[in-house]
């Protein structure tokens, strides 16, 4: 893991097309601005983990499958 120190208003670059700028610092809270191409997915780690957990739970409960299949038939 690379650890960098940055001050408010300073940035780091990831590759040629992703820029992360420190927008504000208040105590332990840091606000960052991220500029990246639209095709780059940017999500908070805790949100991605929550979605993954919900997907696992949904896959374990097949009782909702018939209703899902009926909804999908509308688009075929």
UniProtKB/Swiss-Prot annotation:
Superkingdom field: Bacteria
Statement: the UniProt record of this protein carries the keyword RNA-binding: yes
Signal peptide start-end: none
Keywords from the named record: Bacterial flagellum biogenesis, Cytoplasm, Repressor, RNA-binding, Translation regulation
Subcellular location: Cytoplasm
Biological process terms in GO annotation: bacterial-type flagellum organization; mRNA catabolic process; negative regulation of translational initiation; regulation of bacterial-type flagellum assembly; regulation of carbohydrate metabolic process
UniProt-listed InterPro entries: CsrA (IPR003751), CsrA_sf (IPR036107)
GO MF entry, a single one: mRNA 5'-UTR binding
Any matching Pfam family: CsrA
One GO location term (cellular component): cytosol
Purpose of the protein: A translational regulator that binds mRNA to regulate translation initiation and/or mRNA stability. Usually binds in the 5'-UTR at or near the Shine-Dalgarno sequence preventing ribosome-binding, thus repressing translation. Its main target seems to be the major flagellin gene, while its function is anatagonized by FliW.
Family annotation (PANTHER family): CARBON STORAGE REGULATOR
Entry similarity comment: Belongs to the CsrA/RsmA family.
Subunit structure: Homodimer; the beta-strands of each monomer intercalate to form a hydrophobic core, while the alpha-helices form wings that extend away from the core.
Protein name, entry field: Translational regulator CsrA
Originating species: Syntrophomonas wolfei subsp. wolfei (strain DSM 2245B / Goettingen)
Gene (name only): csrA
